[in-house]
């Protein structure tokens, strides 16, 4: 089973693109897409539920369920037509981002049983129905491979057009760990990532870093490898003022952004100190 993890907040204008991208995946295996709304203050929760109620078998008691918890409301069901597609909707009651609270404990019922984890935030989306199948085929074929990523289109929120592409290489192949480290967290687009859920020995300094994707990319590159597919399967939205990267590149110096910068530096310092062989070889 594959678990797709989608965190979203105040993305009512964009979330339907993400949901459609999840639902259209054609796979030979079941996929549970976990959509976590972090107590949005716009109309996003209702947009998500309307889509869910329209496209999923919410009255099929053999699969579907709803649950009220102290932290949020949960909705789970199978897609009416795509029988390998399941949605788990979690509408949080309180905003966890502002409180620096982890959402991971709430995802264990779906994530723990998954062999692979796919990532896509609420303002990004997938464009190819074979995206997941092709990613998983690589992971199944290459036992040492820890992560797969791909070329990604860049959609300008200001201009409403595709303005370019984000790519790591000009052909399929393994990424050099040096490039993964030196080129930073944007070298690999989050919405293109699928990784093995069985990551053993994930270091503490990576778990406490507030830029979660970047240390995972580094760890996977150094422990098995990251394989790159030179084909566009997804869209990364740029110039979105409500996203973290939009705030980051617009010069927003909020406490959270400063904390992310600080913990990223701490993570890299810890990596260099614990990997002297890599440093001596000039790899980082």
Give the label of every model feature segment.
Residues 232, 236-240, 246-278:
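Catalytic core of nucleotide-sugar-dependent glycosyltransferases
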Residues 23-90:
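Acidic donor-binding segment of Leloir-type glycosyltransferases
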Residues 11-24, 46:
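Short, well-formed alpha-helical segments that are part of the catalytic scaffolds
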Residues 125, 129-163:
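Conserved donor NDP-sugar-binding/catalytic core segment of glycosyltransferases
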Residues 1-3, 32, 215:
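Cell-envelope/extracellular polymer assembly enzymes that use nucleotide-activated donors
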Residues 150, 167-252:
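Conserved nucleotide-sugar donor-binding catalytic segment
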Residues 104-116:
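Active-site nucleotide-sugar/metal-binding loop of Leloir-type enzymes
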């Amino acid at each position: 089973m594959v678990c797709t993890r989608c965190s979203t907040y105040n993305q009512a204008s964009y979330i339907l693109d993400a949901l459609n991208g999840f639902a259209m995946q054609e796979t030979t295996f079941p996929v549970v897409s976990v959509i976590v709304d972090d107590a949005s203050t716009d109309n996003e929760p209702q947009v998500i539920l309307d889509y869910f109620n329209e496209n999923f078998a919410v009255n099929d008691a053999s699969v579907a369920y709803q649950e009220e918890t102290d932290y949020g409301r949960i909705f789970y069901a199978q897609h009416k037509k795509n029988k390998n597609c399941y949605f788990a909707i979690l509408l949080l009651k309180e905003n966890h981002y502002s409180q620096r609270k982890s959402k991971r404990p709430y995802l264990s019922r779906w994530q723990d049983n998954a062999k692979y984890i796919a990532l896509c935030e609420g303002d990004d989306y997938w464009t190819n129905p074979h995206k997941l199948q092709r990613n998983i085929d690589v992971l199944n074929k290459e036992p040492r491979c820890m992560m797969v990523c791909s070329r990604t289109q860049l959609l300008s929120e200001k201009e409403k057009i595709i303005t370019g592409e984000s790519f790591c290489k000009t052909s399929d192949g393994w990424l050099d760990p040096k490039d993964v480290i030196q080129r930073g967290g944007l070298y690999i687009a989050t919405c293109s990532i699928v990784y093995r859920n069985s990551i053993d020995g994930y270091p503490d300094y990576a778990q406490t870093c507030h830029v979660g994707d970047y240390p995972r990319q580094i760890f996977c590159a150094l422990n098995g490898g990251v394989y790159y597919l030179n084909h566009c399967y997804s869209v990364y939205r740029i110039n979105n003022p409500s996203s973290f990267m939009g705030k980051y590149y617009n010069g927003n110096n909020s406490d959270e952004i400063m904390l992310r910068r600080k913990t990223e530096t701490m993570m890299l310092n810890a990596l260099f100190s614990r990997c002297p062989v890599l440093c001596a070889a000039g790899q980082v």
